[in-house]
Swiss-Prot record:
This is Glycine-rich cell wall structural protein. Residues 1-43 are annotated as: Disordered. Responsible for plasticity of the cell wall. Might play a role in wound healing and plant disease resistance. GO terms for biological process: defense response to fungus; killing of cells of another organism. It is found in: Secreted, Cell wall. Keywords: Antimicrobial, Cell wall, Fungicide, Secreted. Signal peptide: none annotated. Belongs to the GRP family. Residues 1-30 have a biased composition (Gly residues). The lineage of its organism: Eukaryota, Viridiplantae, Streptophyta, Embryophyta, Tracheophyta. One of its GO terms (cellular component) is extracellular region.
Length: 43
């Protein structure tokens, strides 16, 4: 298998490819690392 695409979350890479015989490059990570929880700000 080949490399996967870019990760959906910032700072995280992608997974492996699912199609045999096809080599793919790994995707780049996102922007700054963000925590799962977010503080509630006044909108």
């Amino acid at each position: 298998g080949g490399g996967g695409g870019g990760g959906g979350y910032p700072g995280h890479g992608g997974g492996g490819g699912g199609y045999p015989g096809h080599g793919g490059g790994g995707g780049g990570g996102g922007g700054r690392h963000r925590h799962r929880h977010r503080h509630r700000h006044t909108a």
